[in-house]
């Protein structure tokens, strides 16, 4: 992610701004949890997610390319929905003595936490993985009735 180009314009000609671009990009990537781009290094990232609300449910769609159902975990604890995933890579060759010439794919993991709204039904949560997209469905329930205001008598001394 390179936000600094939008702030400073094209600064390729100025070494100060080039180094500043790198520093700003590192800071932004670290803050956002973006995986390093170096080939073969594992990283932690925020999986791109959409949260969609319908009249009957909330749906969370998370991109998890290269992951299957065994690679992701969805947990609920004290009203917080935790979604984690990890993609591991194994560099294998078909024949003994084979050699990996180039390795550009990276292993990575992600972890996100979401506080459920009070109208979420935690007992009906489902999760399914299809073509590298995790879909977590949280059905809605009627929110608890708000208590009527209670008037407290004020007495004099």
UniProtKB/Swiss-Prot annotation:
PANTHER family (alphabetical): HEAT-SHOCK PROTEIN 20 FAMILY MEMBER (PTHR11527)
CDD domains: ACD_sHsps-like (cd06464)
Location(s), subcellular: Plastid, Chloroplast
InterPro entries for the chain: A-crystallin/Hsp20_dom, HSP20-like_chaperone, Small_HSP
UniProt organism field: Chlamydomonas reinhardtii
UniProt entry tagged with the keyword Plastid: yes
UniProt name for this protein: Heat shock 22 kDa protein, chloroplastic
Pfam families xref list: HSP20
PROSITE patterns: SHSP (PS01031)
Induction entry: Regulated by light only upon heat shock.
Stated family: Belongs to the small heat shock protein (HSP20) family.
Keywords: Chloroplast, Plastid, Stress response
Gene Ontology cellular-component terms listed: chloroplast
Residue ranges of domain sHSP in the record: 40-155
Gene3D superfamilies per UniProt: 2.60.40.790
């Amino acid at each position: 992610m390179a936000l600094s180009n939008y702030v400073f314009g094209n600064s390729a000609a100025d070494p100060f701004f080039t180094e500043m671009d790198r520093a700003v990009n590192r800071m932004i990537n670290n803050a956002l949890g973006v995986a390093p781009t170096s080939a073969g290094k594992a990283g932690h990232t925020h999986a791109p997610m959409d949260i969609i609300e319908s009249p009957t449910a909330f749906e969370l769609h998370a991109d998890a390319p290269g992951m299957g159902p065994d690679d992701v975990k969805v947990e609920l604890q004290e009203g917080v929905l935790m979604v984690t995933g990890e993609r591991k890579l194994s560099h294998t060759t078909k024949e003994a003595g084979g050699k990996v010439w180039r390795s550009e794919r990276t292993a990575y993991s992600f972890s996100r936490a979401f506080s459920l709204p009070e109208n979420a039904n935690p007992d009906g949560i489902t999760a399914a993985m299809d073509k590298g997209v995790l879909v977590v469905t949280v059905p809605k329930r009627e929110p608890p009735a708000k208590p009527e205001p209670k008037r407290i008598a004020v007495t004099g001394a």
